Amino acid sequence: MDKTRQTELVRWLKQHSTSAKRWLRISMLLGVVSGLLIIAQAWFLAVILQALIMEHTPREQLLTPFILLLAVFVLRALLTVIRERVGFRCGQVVRQEVRNMVLNKLQALGPVWVKGKPAGSWATIVLEQIEDMQEYYSRYLPQMYLAGIIPIMILIAIFPFNWAAALILFATAPLIPIFMALVGLGAADANRRNFVALGRLSGSFLDRLRGLDTLRLFFREKAEVQQIRESTEDFRSRTMEVLRMAFLSSGVLEFFASISIAIVAVYFGFSYLGELNFGSYGLPVTMFAGFLALILSPEFFQPLRDLGTYYHAKAQAVGAAESLVTLLESDGEQKTETGDKTPQDKPIQIEANKLEIYSHDGQRLVGPLDFTIEPQQRIAVFGQSGAGKSSLLNLLLGFLPYKGSIKINGDELKELCPDKWRALIGWVGQNPHLPEQTLIENICLGKPTASEAEIQQAIDDAYVSEFLPMLPDGLNTRLGDYAARLSVGQAQRVAVARTLLKPSRILLLDEPAASLDAHSEKRVMHTLNQLAQQQTTIMVTHLLEETVNYDQIWVMANGQIIQRGHYAQLSQSEGPFARLLAHRSEEL
């Protein structure tokens, strides 16, 4: 990572501290008050020791300083607790803001773009890398200011009593940040490499875990174990690199702080022996001045030590910020354009003219296409894998950029508000996704205010009621991760019930019967065919017999519509559809 990039990332991190500026200021104020209490604590200790050792003052006369000293101890402890909570709140506010930005960005980019990375990599970015920014905001930023303020306060407290001790501290203090910077020059880059290795490990491990059955069927266990072992070893070595730099930096800090404190102690020792006679403005060096300086000397370097400790929090945050900034600035070579126009709430007509669909990296996937879909017309789309069928659906969902024109009821798609347009879409894919915890929450995902009668109608029409009695808690049954309690067919029926419950103007179906058993396939397709009669429908499918009553059938290949017409027309004429039908008949 070059210096310019690192500076940009630090600037980005500081910009996002504005949302927590109030908490940051409170944390700094508490730190300054804590610094004043440190000076007061040293002052009372020095007064008590001077009185007891040099002046032989009776203890009864020192009751007030003892009480004040105890009060300072209690106040410092309270301030430490409060400051920890304020610091945590400061980091929490920023983390929530950044996480919302990342999630909104992923939503804007759409699932097509997100699928370009393994799920484990996204989990690392959204969870771990954002969490690793916590200490930068809660500790490093406040400490960056306190590291300059508190030492100056301590110098001001010592200087009136002994300028030599103050001068020693003043002269040695700059050595710590200088050597800290030299030692930690590559810390941000090391943290960045560590995050990359962690993302790679998370992605590969999660993908292998999900595909464990397939790997075992093809005897790939040993090869994949070796790959995970290599990723783990890479992550281990990069983690140890970060720790090595952290320990080296801490060692440098402790060394120079110890040397400086030792010089102050030697100075006062020789002064008390009469060997040195300077530093106290021509007066004898008092025990009070010596105790005050020696008690405050470690506290003088403590903010700098803390800054050195938290410096690695900064390096960690910079390393995490690189992938976050890269994500937030990502639009691909082709950006999905959106508008704010409200779509017309009426039966959907779609008209495409010289339509070309592109991936986010600028590759043309489909086109050019010219077609018109009339209101409540049903279209079935066939084609080999990679023909462009799913890309067409993803375009209509607003997840892919395009050139040319595609109009919805006369309005250009890119001019419509994406959220309002998607609110008119009913969607069932081939891999049902049930993100909520319970069955009822997943069914009501698109319409949380649905009545009991509407819910009952949806689960009856989608044949969810067939397996509902087998679930332990009925509609309130927890489904587990990836809907583990349900079979694929049952999960697809839940997805259909969710679509039935949500009012829509256009129905998009992407292989809704894929991977289903015969019983579930029959149930799902019967329900969807009934639903398709009520609205404009585009269905990508491989089930030829389900398209007999559809208004048009499109056959796609290499991003083009190479044949279109009604089932009876296409089955009787020469072409890809007739060949596909003949091939299917031979299989049966």
Curated annotation (Swiss-Prot):
**Intracellular or extracellular location(s):** Cell inner membrane
Entry membrane topology: Multi-pass membrane protein
Example of a GO biological process term: cysteine transport
> Where is the ABC transporter domain positioned along the sequence?
350-583
Q: What is its main location?
A: membrane
SUPFAM superfamilies documented for this protein: ABC transporter transmembrane region, P-loop containing nucleoside triphosphate hydrolases
Q: Which GO terms describe its cellular component?
A: plasma membrane
Q: Which InterPro entries match?
A: AAA+_ATPase (IPR003593), ABC1_TM_dom (IPR011527), ABC1_TM_sf (IPR036640), ABC_transporter-like_ATP-bd (IPR003439), ABC_transporter-like_CS (IPR017871), ABC_transptr_CydD (IPR014216), P-loop_NTPase (IPR027417), Type_1_exporter (IPR039421)
Q: Give binding positions for ATP.
A: G383, Q384, S385, G386, A387, G388, K389, S390
The protein's matches in Gene3D superfamilies, at most eight in alphabetical order, are given as:
ABC transporter type 1, transmembrane domain, P-loop containing nucleotide triphosphate hydrolases
The membrane spanning regions, by residue number, are 29-49, 62-82, 149-169, 170-190, 250-270, 276-296
Q: Which family does it belong to?
A: Belongs to the ABC transporter superfamily.
Q: What does this protein do?
A: Somehow involved in the cytochrome D branch of aerobic respiration. Seems to be a component of a transport system.
- What name does UniProt use for this protein? Transport ATP-binding protein AarD
